[in-house]
């Protein structure tokens, strides 16, 4: 899977968080298409497993927040999940299979694939990591053309990805509850190419943290930044990837910076 690595010239990069989710239903094909139409070089999405083992694209462990349906994703078949409307009455959207998104984005952009396998959730799998296996199998089978980054809050999940697909870049997501330098040390230990603190964790750590990560050979991404000022100063710090629900704004901020790449 070496062909899925990021080109060094791509950075800094704007990541469309769940697609163009400020203007479209999150994690839907409409949202991803809108992000690509804007010129977003990378779209971020969340992957979970249905009851019948299909990787589906949904942030939450249940359907209630983002659809007109209900129920735990891991207890519903793919067809049952597809019956829910993730859009509006006028413009219905279905929860996509991961394979559908791979096919839609292939050759047009990159993917940041967040593995949702969170301790405390009903579907948590602390041994088999079936979701990682299934997601990687879909990337391979789809013949996806473009960079792919596997990210997770769960160190086990990205460790499994690194074990199963060692050439595929991985990134460790973390919140303010985790010490940034401890997260960086873990990433170095585990061979991850990225750390992804939330911006509320990154801002207090300051530009010195970004410098330390870069000196260690680790790239720094952050999420979720929806205001121009924060987006701008994070780029000033040398942050490599900034995820936003408003990729149009992020792309504008990046374009206004002389000498910056746009991915």
Map each language-model feature to its residues:
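Phosphate-group recognition and catalysis centered on beta-loop-alpha active-site segments
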Residues: 1-263
